[in-house]
From Swiss-Prot:
Reaction(s) the record says it catalyses: scutellarein + S-adenosyl-L-methionine = scutellarein 7-methyl ether + S-adenosyl-L-homocysteine; 4',7,8-trihydroxyflavone + S-adenosyl-L-methionine = 4',8-dihydroxy-7-methoxyflavone + S-adenosyl-L-homocysteine; isorhamnetin + S-adenosyl-L-methionine = rhamnacene + S-adenosyl-L-homocysteine + H(+); kaempferol + S-adenosyl-L-methionine = kaempferol 7-methyl ether + S-adenosyl-L-homocysteine + H(+)
Protein name per UniProt: Flavonoid 7-O-methyltransferase 1B
Annotated organism of origin: Mentha piperita
Record gene name: OMT1B
SS bond list: none
GO annotation terms (biological process): methylation
Amino acid sequence: MAPKEDSLALAEAWNHGFGFIKTSIVKTAVELGIPDILESRGAPVSIPELAAAVDCSADRLYRVMRFLAYHGIFKRTEPPPESTGGGSVYYAQTLVSRRLTRENLGPFVLLQGTMREPSGCVTAETLRMSKRPGLVDDNDSDRLYEDPVFSMKVFRDAMASHARMTTAAVIENYGEGFLGVGSLVDVGGSYGMALSMLVKAFPWLRGICFDLPEVVARASPLKGVEFVAGSMFESIPKADVVMLMFVLHNWSDEECVEILKRCKDAVPKNKGKVIIIDAVIDEDGNGDEFTGARLGLDVTMMANMFEGRERTYVEWAHIINEAGFRRHVVKNIKTLESVIEAYP
Protein backbone atom coordinates (compact mmCIF):
# COMPACT_ATOMS: atom_id res chain seq x y z
CA MET A 1 0.00 0.00 0.00
CA ALA A 2 1.31 3.44 -0.93
CA PRO A 3 2.21 5.72 2.02
CA LYS A 4 -0.51 8.23 1.10
CA GLU A 5 -3.19 5.55 0.84
CA ASP A 6 -2.12 4.10 4.19
CA SER A 7 -2.25 7.56 5.76
CA LEU A 8 -5.76 8.14 4.39
CA ALA A 9 -6.88 4.73 5.69
CA LEU A 10 -5.49 5.51 9.14
CA ALA A 11 -7.22 8.91 9.17
CA GLU A 12 -10.51 7.27 8.16
CA ALA A 13 -10.15 4.73 10.98
CA TRP A 14 -9.54 7.57 13.47
CA ASN A 15 -12.60 9.40 12.14
CA HIS A 16 -14.74 6.32 12.79
CA GLY A 17 -13.44 6.24 16.35
CA PHE A 18 -14.80 9.74 16.88
CA GLY A 19 -17.82 9.38 14.60
CA PHE A 20 -20.33 9.75 17.43
CA ILE A 21 -19.03 13.24 18.20
CA LYS A 22 -20.49 14.87 15.09
CA THR A 23 -24.03 13.69 15.78
CA SER A 24 -23.75 14.64 19.45
CA ILE A 25 -22.45 18.15 18.78
CA VAL A 26 -24.95 18.87 15.99
CA LYS A 27 -27.73 17.87 18.40
CA THR A 28 -26.26 20.18 21.07
CA ALA A 29 -26.16 23.08 18.60
CA VAL A 30 -29.83 22.50 17.76
CA GLU A 31 -30.74 22.26 21.47
CA LEU A 32 -29.06 25.63 22.04
CA GLY A 33 -30.90 27.10 19.06
CA ILE A 34 -27.71 28.17 17.28
CA PRO A 35 -29.04 27.53 13.74
CA ASP A 36 -32.11 29.65 14.56
CA ILE A 37 -30.01 32.46 16.05
CA LEU A 38 -27.74 32.69 13.02
CA GLU A 39 -30.71 32.50 10.68
CA SER A 40 -32.63 35.22 12.51
CA ARG A 41 -29.63 37.57 12.64
CA GLY A 42 -29.06 37.25 8.89
CA ALA A 43 -25.43 38.31 9.36
CA PRO A 44 -22.27 36.80 10.90
CA VAL A 45 -22.27 36.64 14.71
CA SER A 46 -19.19 36.80 16.93
CA ILE A 47 -18.40 34.08 19.45
CA PRO A 48 -18.91 36.43 22.43
CA GLU A 49 -22.33 37.48 21.09
CA LEU A 50 -23.32 33.89 20.38
CA ALA A 51 -22.09 32.70 23.78
CA ALA A 52 -24.14 35.41 25.49
CA ALA A 53 -27.23 34.48 23.48
CA VAL A 54 -27.05 30.80 24.48
CA ASP A 55 -25.59 31.39 27.97
CA CYS A 56 -22.44 29.28 27.71
CA SER A 57 -18.65 29.56 27.81
CA ALA A 58 -17.24 31.51 24.85
CA ASP A 59 -14.10 29.35 24.77
CA ARG A 60 -16.01 26.06 24.77
CA LEU A 61 -18.50 27.36 22.23
CA TYR A 62 -15.68 28.43 19.95
CA ARG A 63 -14.23 24.92 19.97
CA VAL A 64 -17.62 23.45 19.13
CA MET A 65 -18.23 25.96 16.33
CA ARG A 66 -14.75 25.32 14.94
CA PHE A 67 -15.57 21.60 14.75
CA LEU A 68 -18.96 22.21 13.12
CA ALA A 69 -17.51 24.68 10.62
CA TYR A 70 -14.92 22.08 9.58
CA HIS A 71 -17.81 19.73 8.81
CA GLY A 72 -19.71 22.38 6.85
CA ILE A 73 -22.54 22.90 9.33
CA PHE A 74 -21.65 26.57 9.85
CA LYS A 75 -19.01 28.75 8.21
CA ARG A 76 -16.33 30.95 9.71
CA THR A 77 -16.39 34.41 8.17
CA GLU A 78 -14.66 37.75 8.30
CA PRO A 79 -16.11 40.32 10.72
CA PRO A 80 -18.69 42.61 9.11
CA PRO A 81 -17.43 46.14 8.32
CA GLU A 82 -19.39 47.70 11.16
CA SER A 83 -18.03 45.16 13.66
CA THR A 84 -16.62 46.29 17.00
CA GLY A 85 -15.74 42.76 18.05
CA GLY A 86 -12.05 43.46 18.47
CA GLY A 87 -10.72 40.53 16.47
CA SER A 88 -13.35 38.01 17.55
CA VAL A 89 -14.12 35.02 15.38
CA TYR A 90 -17.43 35.25 13.50
CA TYR A 91 -19.70 32.48 12.23
CA ALA A 92 -22.62 32.50 9.81
CA GLN A 93 -25.32 30.12 8.66
CA THR A 94 -25.01 27.72 5.72
CA LEU A 95 -27.56 25.87 3.61
CA VAL A 96 -27.07 22.93 5.98
CA SER A 97 -27.63 24.94 9.16
CA ARG A 98 -30.80 26.41 7.65
CA ARG A 99 -32.13 22.85 7.45
CA LEU A 100 -31.38 22.42 11.17
CA THR A 101 -33.69 25.17 12.44
CA ARG A 102 -36.77 24.40 14.52
CA GLU A 103 -38.99 24.93 11.47
CA ASN A 104 -36.99 22.44 9.44
CA LEU A 105 -35.34 19.19 10.57
CA GLY A 106 -34.04 20.47 13.91
CA PRO A 107 -36.70 18.55 15.88
CA PHE A 108 -35.74 15.34 14.07
CA VAL A 109 -32.10 15.80 15.11
CA LEU A 110 -33.23 16.24 18.73
CA LEU A 111 -34.76 12.75 18.61
CA GLN A 112 -31.34 11.13 18.31
CA GLY A 113 -30.10 9.57 21.54
CA THR A 114 -33.47 9.75 23.31
CA MET A 115 -34.71 6.29 22.40
CA ARG A 116 -34.28 3.25 24.63
CA GLU A 117 -31.53 2.23 22.26
CA PRO A 118 -29.85 5.18 20.54
CA SER A 119 -31.31 5.52 17.09
CA GLY A 120 -29.25 3.51 14.64
CA CYS A 121 -27.43 1.56 17.39
CA VAL A 122 -27.04 -1.87 15.81
CA THR A 123 -25.02 -4.18 18.06
CA ALA A 124 -23.70 -7.69 17.50
CA GLU A 125 -26.58 -8.86 19.68
CA THR A 126 -29.05 -7.10 17.39
CA LEU A 127 -27.67 -8.96 14.37
CA ARG A 128 -27.78 -12.37 16.09
CA MET A 129 -31.40 -12.20 17.21
CA SER A 130 -34.02 -13.80 15.01
CA LYS A 131 -36.86 -12.12 16.89
CA ARG A 132 -36.65 -9.19 19.25
CA PRO A 133 -39.10 -6.53 20.33
CA GLY A 134 -37.87 -3.19 19.09
CA LEU A 135 -38.87 0.26 20.22
CA VAL A 136 -42.44 -0.61 19.30
CA ASP A 137 -43.63 -4.21 19.55
CA ASP A 138 -46.84 -5.32 17.86
CA ASN A 139 -47.70 -1.67 17.22
CA ASP A 140 -47.88 -1.04 20.99
CA SER A 141 -46.77 2.53 21.56
CA ASP A 142 -47.17 2.25 25.34
CA ARG A 143 -43.53 1.23 25.63
CA LEU A 144 -42.56 4.69 24.41
CA TYR A 145 -44.07 6.19 27.54
CA GLU A 146 -42.25 3.82 29.93
CA ASP A 147 -38.72 5.06 29.20
CA PRO A 148 -37.81 8.02 31.44
CA VAL A 149 -35.29 9.28 28.87
CA PHE A 150 -37.69 9.11 25.96
CA SER A 151 -39.97 12.10 25.49
CA MET A 152 -43.14 11.64 23.50
CA LYS A 153 -43.11 15.36 22.75
CA VAL A 154 -39.62 15.07 21.25
CA PHE A 155 -40.79 12.05 19.24
CA ARG A 156 -43.93 13.77 17.95
CA ASP A 157 -42.04 16.95 17.11
CA ALA A 158 -39.46 14.89 15.22
CA MET A 159 -42.08 13.02 13.23
CA ALA A 160 -43.91 16.27 12.49
CA SER A 161 -40.77 17.96 11.18
CA HIS A 162 -40.01 14.93 9.00
CA ALA A 163 -43.56 14.87 7.64
CA ARG A 164 -43.57 18.63 7.09
CA MET A 165 -40.36 18.56 5.04
CA THR A 166 -41.43 15.51 3.02
CA THR A 167 -44.92 16.86 2.33
CA ALA A 168 -43.40 20.12 1.10
CA ALA A 169 -41.26 18.08 -1.31
CA VAL A 170 -44.34 16.15 -2.47
CA ILE A 171 -46.22 19.40 -3.13
CA GLU A 172 -43.30 20.93 -5.02
CA ASN A 173 -42.26 17.90 -7.06
CA TYR A 174 -45.39 15.76 -7.36
CA GLY A 175 -48.23 18.25 -7.68
CA GLU A 176 -49.44 16.69 -10.93
CA GLY A 177 -50.20 13.50 -9.02
CA PHE A 178 -53.21 15.17 -7.38
CA LEU A 179 -54.79 16.61 -10.53
CA GLY A 180 -58.25 15.17 -11.03
CA VAL A 181 -58.27 13.57 -7.57
CA GLY A 182 -61.46 14.25 -5.64
CA SER A 183 -60.80 12.45 -2.37
CA LEU A 184 -57.64 11.32 -0.58
CA VAL A 185 -57.27 9.04 2.45
CA ASP A 186 -54.06 9.41 4.46
CA VAL A 187 -53.62 6.03 6.18
CA GLY A 188 -51.81 6.38 9.48
CA GLY A 189 -52.16 10.13 9.06
CA SER A 190 -51.77 10.85 12.80
CA TYR A 191 -53.09 14.33 13.62
CA GLY A 192 -53.52 15.33 9.97
CA MET A 193 -50.63 17.74 9.49
CA ALA A 194 -49.45 16.31 6.15
CA LEU A 195 -53.01 16.02 4.86
CA SER A 196 -53.85 19.59 5.86
CA MET A 197 -50.81 20.82 3.91
CA LEU A 198 -51.97 18.88 0.84
CA VAL A 199 -55.56 20.16 1.11
CA LYS A 200 -54.28 23.71 1.41
CA ALA A 201 -52.02 23.28 -1.65
CA PHE A 202 -54.70 21.44 -3.66
CA PRO A 203 -58.03 22.83 -2.37
CA TRP A 204 -60.15 20.57 -4.57
CA LEU A 205 -59.12 17.58 -2.43
CA ARG A 206 -61.43 16.12 0.19
CA GLY A 207 -59.06 14.88 2.86
CA ILE A 208 -59.72 11.89 5.12
CA CYS A 209 -57.22 11.26 7.92
CA PHE A 210 -57.43 7.60 8.95
CA ASP A 211 -55.75 6.33 12.10
CA LEU A 212 -56.31 4.30 15.25
CA PRO A 213 -59.18 5.37 17.54
CA GLU A 214 -56.83 6.55 20.31
CA VAL A 215 -55.00 8.80 17.83
CA VAL A 216 -58.15 10.24 16.28
CA ALA A 217 -59.53 10.95 19.76
CA ARG A 218 -56.61 13.31 20.43
CA ALA A 219 -56.73 15.09 17.06
CA SER A 220 -57.81 18.72 16.78
CA PRO A 221 -60.18 19.84 14.00
CA LEU A 222 -58.48 20.89 10.76
CA LYS A 223 -60.03 22.73 7.84
CA GLY A 224 -60.71 20.38 4.93
CA VAL A 225 -59.79 17.25 6.91
CA GLU A 226 -62.21 14.58 8.15
CA PHE A 227 -60.90 12.21 10.83
CA VAL A 228 -61.94 8.56 10.67
CA ALA A 229 -60.92 5.89 13.20
CA GLY A 230 -60.18 2.28 12.38
CA SER A 231 -57.53 -0.32 11.60
CA MET A 232 -55.70 -0.50 8.28
CA PHE A 233 -55.56 -4.28 8.66
CA GLU A 234 -59.36 -4.48 8.55
CA SER A 235 -60.74 -1.88 6.13
CA ILE A 236 -59.87 1.57 4.81
CA PRO A 237 -62.35 4.35 3.86
CA LYS A 238 -63.15 4.55 0.16
CA ALA A 239 -61.47 7.32 -1.83
CA ASP A 240 -59.99 8.10 -5.24
CA VAL A 241 -56.48 7.83 -3.80
CA VAL A 242 -55.01 6.21 -0.70
CA MET A 243 -51.73 7.56 0.66
CA LEU A 244 -49.27 5.76 2.93
CA MET A 245 -46.55 8.08 4.21
CA PHE A 246 -43.82 6.50 6.40
CA VAL A 247 -46.13 3.56 7.13
CA LEU A 248 -44.92 0.47 5.30
CA HIS A 249 -41.30 0.75 6.45
CA ASN A 250 -42.56 -0.16 9.94
CA TRP A 251 -43.88 -3.56 8.89
CA SER A 252 -42.76 -6.95 7.58
CA ASP A 253 -43.30 -7.89 3.93
CA GLU A 254 -46.25 -10.09 4.85
CA GLU A 255 -47.92 -7.32 6.82
CA CYS A 256 -47.24 -4.81 4.04
CA VAL A 257 -48.98 -7.07 1.55
CA GLU A 258 -52.06 -7.22 3.81
CA ILE A 259 -52.09 -3.43 4.25
CA LEU A 260 -51.72 -2.89 0.50
CA LYS A 261 -54.57 -5.29 -0.23
CA ARG A 262 -56.85 -3.22 2.02
CA CYS A 263 -55.67 -0.07 0.23
CA LYS A 264 -56.36 -1.63 -3.17
CA ASP A 265 -59.90 -2.49 -2.05
CA ALA A 266 -60.48 1.16 -1.06
CA VAL A 267 -59.77 2.79 -4.45
CA PRO A 268 -61.62 2.55 -7.80
CA LYS A 269 -60.19 -0.17 -10.00
CA ASN A 270 -60.03 1.87 -13.20
CA LYS A 271 -58.95 5.33 -12.04
CA GLY A 272 -57.75 4.89 -8.47
CA LYS A 273 -54.20 4.57 -7.17
CA VAL A 274 -52.26 4.06 -3.98
CA ILE A 275 -49.45 6.51 -3.22
CA ILE A 276 -46.62 5.12 -1.09
CA ILE A 277 -44.18 7.68 0.30
CA ASP A 278 -41.13 5.87 1.63
CA ALA A 279 -37.43 5.47 0.91
CA VAL A 280 -36.25 3.41 -2.07
CA ILE A 281 -32.71 2.14 -1.54
CA ASP A 282 -30.36 2.05 -4.50
CA GLU A 283 -28.13 -1.01 -4.89
CA ASP A 284 -26.85 -0.53 -8.44
CA GLY A 285 -24.43 2.31 -7.75
CA ASN A 286 -26.64 5.01 -9.26
CA GLY A 287 -27.78 6.59 -6.01
CA ASP A 288 -28.10 10.28 -5.24
CA GLU A 289 -27.06 12.55 -2.40
CA PHE A 290 -29.65 10.95 -0.09
CA THR A 291 -28.36 7.35 -0.43
CA GLY A 292 -26.28 7.49 2.75
CA ALA A 293 -29.21 8.84 4.77
CA ARG A 294 -31.50 6.12 3.41
CA LEU A 295 -29.04 3.42 4.42
CA GLY A 296 -28.75 5.04 7.85
CA LEU A 297 -32.52 5.10 8.19
CA ASP A 298 -32.64 1.40 7.30
CA VAL A 299 -30.30 0.36 10.12
CA THR A 300 -32.14 2.74 12.47
CA MET A 301 -35.35 0.86 11.69
CA MET A 302 -33.55 -2.44 12.31
CA ALA A 303 -32.35 -1.20 15.71
CA ASN A 304 -35.66 0.17 16.92
CA MET A 305 -38.38 -1.80 15.14
CA PHE A 306 -37.38 -5.39 14.52
CA GLU A 307 -39.48 -5.89 11.40
CA GLY A 308 -38.90 -2.35 10.13
CA ARG A 309 -36.78 -1.78 7.03
CA GLU A 310 -36.23 0.47 4.05
CA ARG A 311 -36.64 -1.38 0.75
CA THR A 312 -34.94 -1.55 -2.62
CA TYR A 313 -36.82 -1.16 -5.88
CA VAL A 314 -36.91 -4.97 -6.25
CA GLU A 315 -38.23 -5.42 -2.71
CA TRP A 316 -40.95 -2.81 -3.28
CA ALA A 317 -41.91 -4.50 -6.55
CA HIS A 318 -42.26 -7.82 -4.74
CA ILE A 319 -44.74 -6.66 -2.09
CA ILE A 320 -46.71 -4.48 -4.53
CA ASN A 321 -47.08 -7.37 -6.97
CA GLU A 322 -47.97 -9.78 -4.15
CA ALA A 323 -50.79 -7.42 -3.15
CA GLY A 324 -52.26 -7.74 -6.65
CA PHE A 325 -51.49 -4.37 -8.25
CA ARG A 326 -51.23 -4.26 -12.05
CA ARG A 327 -48.27 -1.89 -12.21
CA HIS A 328 -46.33 0.69 -10.24
CA VAL A 329 -44.12 3.70 -10.91
CA VAL A 330 -41.37 5.17 -8.72
CA LYS A 331 -40.97 8.96 -8.84
CA ASN A 332 -38.08 10.96 -7.39
CA ILE A 333 -39.21 13.95 -5.31
CA LYS A 334 -35.71 15.26 -4.46
CA THR A 335 -35.67 14.16 -0.84
CA LEU A 336 -35.03 11.08 1.30
CA GLU A 337 -38.27 9.42 0.22
CA SER A 338 -39.73 8.68 -3.18
CA VAL A 339 -43.34 8.51 -4.35
CA ILE A 340 -44.42 5.06 -5.50
CA GLU A 341 -47.68 4.99 -7.46
CA ALA A 342 -49.41 1.60 -7.40
CA TYR A 343 -52.34 0.98 -9.73
CA PRO A 344 -54.99 -1.72 -9.02
